[in-house]
Structure formats: structure tokens, C-alpha cells
């Protein structure tokens, strides 16, 4: 099965048109497949020994509620989620036969997402701990050691799974907004003059293809994200995106406070 739908120019040259429709089913299968495999693995996993306690000097600097997400970061998360879900529904429902004036809805949600991501980049780079969300060699060394891992082997603010998911969303999200922004030049909007000749046929085909692949990939990512957010053992992390903070006990048993910026009193 061809993963790319091809067309031809008036001169008989083959050009890509968009990602093949059947790839959406592969994305759904991948998302639900990861869900099932992980759920079965966790169900069969035997309880391990209790997590070793953090050193008293280190535990003493951890407050009852540990700040994790600022209000702007939380607002961006939920606003981005609303935009992305709107984009997915307005992209795939018409293809499934649910017809409505989707073009205006789609490009409006896309523009809002572009502005939101631009805000988040500035906010993350200049007002947040920008490096804490990116995977490092230390994350790989401590990955998979379980809850009974020594404190020094535990993650800091973000576990490796969170960092890898964020990296995937960055790649998919930026691909969507860059290609989508270029595609806006092909339709009539109140913001700029329509110019379908900004690129040649082959370039437009590549842009549409990348946009479609990003949208299809987002389907699998959304399924995985909702699944992990709904898991009982992930509730402290999920609730932090609403409340902005995490319980002290969860931090002490699942994270290394020192990597989270906690400095014992004796070292200050």
C-alpha cells in the first residue's frame, strides 16, 4: 500500500499530494497498541520493594506542595490541547463523512495554535527552566530502574517518558504549524492576500505531505497522552497540570529533589 497519494502536473511530472488516508488507521492502531501493551505489562508487574527514603537533609527542603507548573504553563497546555483537538476534528471528520464548514474552523484554530506556541517558546526560554525538559544521558542511565531505585538514580522534575513525549510533540507541533502557516497562503483569509503560487507544485506537495503526516502522528500521541494521564499511578503528575503542584510524599518517593533544584540547608 502506498503511504503517499501522488498526482501529476500538467507536464506529466509526478508530485506528492498528501499522506494516504489509510495511515490514520495505522496511527490509531499504534496508539491503542501502546495503550494495551503498557496496561498488560503494568497489570502483570509484581509490586517491588518500597522506595528508599531520601536523605533527611534533602527531604527537609521539600515543602508540603512542590511547585511543578506555573499558571502560564498550565494555561498554555490546556489552550494548546483545545486547539489541537479542534484541528484534528476539523481535519478528519469531513473525511469520515461528517460535513460542516471546516476550513474556517481549521485555520482559526491553527492561527491560535501558532500564537500560543510562539508565546510558549518565549516564556519557556526566558522565564522557565528551559533545560529541565530535554533528555540527557543521566536520564537514560536511570531509566527503568523502578520505584526502588536509589534517590540519585531517580529523575528530577521531569521523568524520561515526559521528556521524550515533549520532544515528540515539539517535532510534530512545529511541523504542523510551520506547514499549516504556509498553507494559509492558499486560502482567502482576512489577514493577507491569497497567493497559491508562492511555491511550485512539488514544494506544495511536500508541504501538504508533511502537514498530513504530522496530523496523523498527533492522533497516536493524543491517545497515548490521554491514557497515561488517566492511569491511577500517574494521577499526581496529571493533577499537577491542574493545580500546579505535587504532593511532597510523591516527590520524595519518585524524584530526586536535588535534581529539582532542592538544596539541603547544610549546603546553603
Regions found by a protein language model. Give the residues of each.
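Membrane-embedded alpha-helical bundles that constitute the cytochrome b-like, heme-associated redox core
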Residues: 1-268
Amino acid at each position: 500500500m502506498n503511504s503517499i497519494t501522488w498526482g501529476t502536473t500538467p507536464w506529466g511530472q509526478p508530485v506528492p499530494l498528501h499522506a494516504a488516508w489509510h495511515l490514520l488507521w495505522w496511527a490509531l492502531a499504534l496508539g491503542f497498541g501502546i495503550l494495551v501493551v503498557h496496561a498488560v505489562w503494568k497489570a502483570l508487574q509484581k509490586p517491588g520493594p518500597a522506595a528508599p527514603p531520601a536523605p533527611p537533609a534533602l527531604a527537609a527542603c521539600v515543602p508540603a506542595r512542590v511547585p511543578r507548573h506555573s499558571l502560564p504553563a498550565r494555561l498554555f497546555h490546556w489552550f494548546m490541547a483545545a486547539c489541537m483537538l479542534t484541528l484534528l476534528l476539523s481535519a478528519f471528520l469531513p473525511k469520515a463523512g461528517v460535513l460542516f464548514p471546516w476550513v474556517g474552523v481549521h485555520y482559526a484554530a491553527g492561527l491560535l495554535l501558532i500564537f500560543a506556541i510562539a508565546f510558549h517558546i518565549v516564556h519557556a526560554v526566558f522565564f522557565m527552566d528551559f533545560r529541565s525538559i530535554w533528555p540527557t544521558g543521566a536520564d537514560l542511565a536511570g531509566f527503568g530502574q523502578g520505584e526502588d531505585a536509589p534517590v540519585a538514580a531517580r529523575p528530577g522534575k521531569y521523568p524520561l517518558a515526559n521528556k521524550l513525549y515533549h520532544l515528540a510533540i515539539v517535532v510534530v507541533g512545529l511541523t504542523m504549524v510551520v506547514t499549516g502557516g504556509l498553507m494559509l497562503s492558499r486560502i482567502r483569509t482576512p489577514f493577507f492576500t491569497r497567493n497559491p503560487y508562492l511555491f511550485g507544485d512539488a514544494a506544495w506537495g511536500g508541504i501538504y505531505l508533511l502537514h498530513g503526516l504530522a496530523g496523523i502522528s498527533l492522533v497516536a500521541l493524543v491517545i497515548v497522552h490521554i491514557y497515561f494521564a488517566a492511569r491511577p499511578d500517574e494521577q499526581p503528575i496529571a493533577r499537577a497540570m491542574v493545580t500546579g503542584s505535587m504532593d511532597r510524599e510523591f516527590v520524595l518517593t519518585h524524584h530526586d529533589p536535588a535534581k529539582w533544584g532542592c538544596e539541603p540547608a547544610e549546603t546553603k
